[in-house]
Amino acid sequence: MAGKTLYDKLWDDHVVTQRDDGSCLLYIDRHLLHEVTSPQAFEGLQLAGRQPWRLSANVATPDHNVPTSKKERDQGIAGIEDDTSRIQVQTLDDNCKAFNIVEFGINDIRQGIVHVVGPEQGLTLPGMTVVCGDSHTATHGAFGCLAHGIGTSEVEHVLATQCLVQKKSKNMLVRVDGVLGKGVTPKDVVLAIIGKIGTAGGTGYAIEFGGQVFRDMSIEGRMTVCNMAIEAGARVGMVAVDDKTIEYVKGRSYAPKGEQWEQAVAYWNTLHSDVDAVFDAVVELNGAEIEPQVSWGTSPEMVIPVSKAVPTLEQAKDDVQRNDWTRAYQYMGLNAGQALADIQLDRVFIGSCTNSRIEDIRAAAEVVKGRKVAPSIKQAMIVPGSGLVKQQAEKEGLDKIFLEAGFEWREPGCSMCLAMNADKLQPGEHCASTSNRNFEGRQGNGGRTHLVSPAMAAAAAIAGHFVDVRSF
């Protein structure tokens, strides 16, 4: 009998019962909540007269709608100008109080983007099933977790039962061996993967990321890669547990202590695919060949190395891709064959659940130090992923580096990743962004998003256009 993959092990460990249709009832260890997908779920509980099944499994924080300007944040929820956003944040606050759920509120130092806060607090632990009403929940798979996003009706179901009906995915291994070159980051790795397999390449699969590149990669880097598994079409992305994983978790607020810690570590050390495990699909890349990446179009798969030009229609693989590229040229205001360096940028955004952790901010600061934002850039902003990330960056003096260069240093939140708060692009503006999606209107109506790493975004802010950070 063949060995098990990591996904198989996690799935089997959480099956409560198997149903006649082949689906399974899975037990959920951790449920993370935010203000956008939870109001109707809480209302459903209230109407049915139910209480959360296991209070301690649920933790909430507002992130999508919170303002990132200090002036507004100092006023708390009342400082949120948009009525809908304010109501959503207030409703989360009210619901958490009514149901006695732990919430890191808008001015709590622990508040931040839910996928930054979970690992930071030790709420995300190896071997867990982790769900959240947010598609980028795959981030937590970096800890050897089975983590994925859920819809609002499922949020209610998890609150009420601590279980979820799911159908098992197939197994895919994405193996990246070799050593990354100077200036090549985890963000470039995952963009290169998506560029290779496309945004539907992982559909129906749980992706395990393996190989030397991931063994060498930091935990925060692994979070960046797993975060964008959904952009590759997979709900689930994960990396096997190793010593780095355990060291990262150790001592965090919600991590086990004492004898429980020793028992947990013994289990966590089993969380890897067996050597004889069989995957349904295997994708391989050579890490040494990956360059800094820049997305040029309106899908994450429309991505190329910074050294290349916008592809021409002759390079498209079929009529569907030709049509997609033609529409993307028009929306993005680009020409086929245009050099990336010729794209005039208007704004730079360094933040989001993909790239707002302390390592990301350090990488950007290293590029920015002693330089100035180009006069042609209307706005360059750094948005830490949590209050604690912000605090650590300020302790290291990174905020001063950015402020002296002409960047804005903001309060934590989802910010310009999506047009659900005050941080938005204007129509026609080009933005170098460390976020995860570049769909039409994602950062604001008519806004044009280019996905890059923190180092590439920082270099673009200084130059006013895209440059190869390796020679910057």
UniProtKB/Swiss-Prot annotation:
E.C. number: 4.2.1.33
GO BP annotation list: L-leucine biosynthetic process
Keyword annotations: 4Fe-4S, Amino-acid biosynthesis, Branched-chain amino acid biosynthesis, Iron, Iron-sulfur, Leucine biosynthesis, Lyase, Metal-binding
Catalytic activities: (2R,3S)-3-isopropylmalate = (2S)-2-isopropylmalate
Positions annotated to bind [4Fe-4S] cluster: C353, C414, C417
Pathways involved: Amino-acid biosynthesis; L-leucine biosynthesis; L-leucine from 3-methyl-2-oxobutanoate: step 2/4
First-tier enzyme category under EC: lyase
InterPro entries according to UniProt: 3-IsopropMal_deHydase_lsu, Acnase/IPM_dHydase_lsu_aba_1/3, Acoase/IPM_deHydtase_lsu_aba, Aconitase_4Fe-4S_BS, Aconitase_4Fe-4S_dom, IPM_dehydratase_rel_enz, IPMI_cat
Cofactor annotation: [4Fe-4S] cluster
Family affiliation: Belongs to the aconitase/IPM isomerase family. LeuC type 1 subfamily.
Name by which UniProt lists this protein: 3-isopropylmalate dehydratase large subunit
Annotated source species: Acinetobacter baumannii (strain ACICU)
